[in-house]
Amino acid sequence: YRRQRQMCIRDRNDIQAECVELNFSTCQGHVVELANLLVAYFRKKDYDVKKLKGSINYDFFNKMLTRGKEKGDMVQTAKALIEAIQPLPFYRVLNVNALSLNNAGAYISQELGYALAWGNEYMNQLTDAGIPAATVAKKIKFNFGISSNYFLEIAKFRAARMLWANIVASYHPECLRDCDNKGANGECRCAAKMA
């Protein structure tokens, strides 16, 4: 099984990883292994890691929501995943798949509220485990569903960005690098950007 996955990654010589965002999904039990494979592959191919963007779909809460199953310890897996993907600074590995709420019939306000609570739970548990708030916030990716109500969907995305920035700011994330996007107290504003 592992050999098959390695071959799948190896056979992707025609993909320009620096030009397109790559998003991967795998079994929840193998996300750390996938992260290690990706880091090794990108290093072997001499990619500029600052140009690589993408995600690994690790969503602990979605598994419980859709199947009623809890697999493993979320905090331990998330910490190992964040550590494994550290060489790829623009890869997000903690997903909030609010799409499943939308597909289950949630209204726009319900989807938005639950998604933000979901993201806040990641922030809460992982900052309590000792991971800096700026690091956690930069590793979360939101996947929203889109309904046919055009103007309310636009409003949902704008509200999500604003509300997520407020949630992240409440954790007082410290900027881990020298950037021009610092707040009044050295707060990391780039951590609050939603992907």
Model-found features: residue ranges?
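Single conserved hydrophobic/aromatic residue that forms the stacking wall/gate
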Residues: 1-9
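A general secondary-structure signal for short beta-strands and their flanking turns/coil
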Residues: 2, 17, 137-139
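Alpha-helix-loop-beta-strand connector modules within alpha/beta enzyme cores
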Residues: 10-19
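Helix-rich catalytic cores of soluble enzyme domains
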Residues: 22-195
